[in-house]
Amino acid sequence: MRNQMKIALLVGLAIVCIGLFLFYDLGNWDYTLPRRIKKVAAIVLTGGAIAFSTMIFQTITNNRILTPSILGLDSLYMLIQTGIIFLFGSANMVIMNKNINFIISVLLMILFSLVLYQIMFKGEGRNIFFLLLIGIVFGTLFSSLSSFMQMLIDPNEFQVVQDKMFASFNNINTDLLWLAFIIFLLTGVYVWRFTKFFDVLSLGREHAVNLGIDYDKVVKQMLIVVAILVSVSTALVGPIMFLGLLVVNLAREFLKTYKHSYLIAGSVFISIIALVGGQFVVEKVFTFSTTLSVIINFAGGIYFIYLLLKENKSW
């Protein structure tokens, strides 16, 4: 099957999943349909942002088992949210305004990515693996600081923080939908012209430089893009650890191509199918007895172990 046909198949499955979610057991159209449309839009945006950012990140790191969470961006997001509550309280209407909070989170995550990038290329012989090591250290630091502040704040305000700690597709922040959509659209348009570079970047730094790619500049720009996309997805539903790893590697296995124009589209549609279809199953089959994030992390964790064992055998 050609890759165009495979992408068309994924698009068809995504449309079927969205149609089922929107129209199955609808009941009162006027009340239910607008809410389901908002929910589906947020899920699609989240799935697209996670898949897009993970594919870009794996390309610039040239590693199939890494996700942007290794940079500590998820931990930084939680530190920002905890710090805001700790310093200003949950009653501060300006800081707790969802749009202002979202913009602050995005800007701080971009700033952190730039600082990491400067550390990465400050000395000779530093490479992407040094960046990942620093990211792990900072991620641990941010998690520890968040836990420390959570121990000190008022229990009622801790409840506000706790709502942001876990991914929830039943309590999606739809107020940010238009802002997130505009950011995602602009980011996608900006990144699309780099897709021809991604095919070369996936060969590694030395090959990319030899073939005329301004490696440092492109990596710096893509790290900013990853920070933006991660902040969009995290602000909408909360942190999800393994979704990107799962859908990107499934896209690679399904499409079996090096062309990122196909891989990005495939991973985005697989992510949409997984999230919308998974949420439909959680609501209609499991009747909310479990959550989609638990299923994703469980399946993603098993697949991560499989990838490690598979790569170990290839070594």
Curated annotation (Swiss-Prot):
<dbReference type="InterPro" id="IPR000522">
    <property type="entry name" value="ABC_transptr_permease_BtuC"/>
</dbReference>
<dbReference type="GO" id="GO:0022857">
    <property type="term" value="F:transmembrane transporter activity"/>
</dbReference>
<dbReference type="InterPro" id="IPR037294">
    <property type="entry name" value="ABC_BtuC-like"/>
</dbReference>
<feature type="transmembrane region" description="Helical">
    <location>
        <begin position="128"/>
        <end position="148"/>
    </location>
</feature>
<dbReference type="GO" id="GO:0033214">
    <property type="term" value="P:siderophore-dependent iron import into cell"/>
</dbReference>
<comment type="similarity">
    <text>Belongs to the binding-protein-dependent transport system permease family. FecCD subfamily.</text>
</comment>
<dbReference type="GO" id="GO:0005886">
    <property type="term" value="C:plasma membrane"/>
</dbReference>
<comment type="function">
    <text>Part of the ABC transporter complex YclNOPQ involved in uptake of ferric-petrobactin. Petrobactin is a photoreactive 3,4-catecholate siderophore produced by many members of the B.cereus group, including B.anthracis. Probably responsible for the translocation of the substrate across the membrane.</text>
</comment>
<keyword id="KW-0406">Ion transport</keyword>
<dbReference type="Pfam" id="PF01032">
    <property type="entry name" value="FecCD"/>
</dbReference>
<feature type="transmembrane region" description="Helical">
    <location>
        <begin position="288"/>
        <end position="308"/>
    </location>
</feature>
<feature type="transmembrane region" description="Helical">
    <location>
        <begin position="7"/>
        <end position="27"/>
    </location>
</feature>
<keyword id="KW-0408">Iron</keyword>
<feature type="transmembrane region" description="Helical">
    <location>
        <begin position="100"/>
        <end position="120"/>
    </location>
</feature>
<keyword id="KW-0813">Transport</keyword>
<keyword id="KW-0812">Transmembrane</keyword>
<feature type="transmembrane region" description="Helical">
    <location>
        <begin position="76"/>
        <end position="96"/>
    </location>
</feature>
<feature type="transmembrane region" description="Helical">
    <location>
        <begin position="223"/>
        <end position="243"/>
    </location>
</feature>
<feature type="transmembrane region" description="Helical">
    <location>
        <begin position="262"/>
        <end position="282"/>
    </location>
</feature>
<keyword id="KW-1133">Transmembrane helix</keyword>
<comment type="subunit">
    <text>The complex is composed of two ATP-binding proteins (YclP), two transmembrane proteins (YclN and YclO) and a solute-binding protein (YclQ).</text>
</comment>
<feature type="transmembrane region" description="Helical">
    <location>
        <begin position="172"/>
        <end position="192"/>
    </location>
</feature>
<keyword id="KW-0472">Membrane</keyword>
<keyword id="KW-0410">Iron transport</keyword>
<protein>
    <recommendedName>
        <fullName>Petrobactin import system permease protein YclO</fullName>
    </recommendedName>
</protein>
<keyword id="KW-1003">Cell membrane</keyword>
<feature type="transmembrane region" description="Helical">
    <location>
        <begin position="40"/>
        <end position="60"/>
    </location>
</feature>
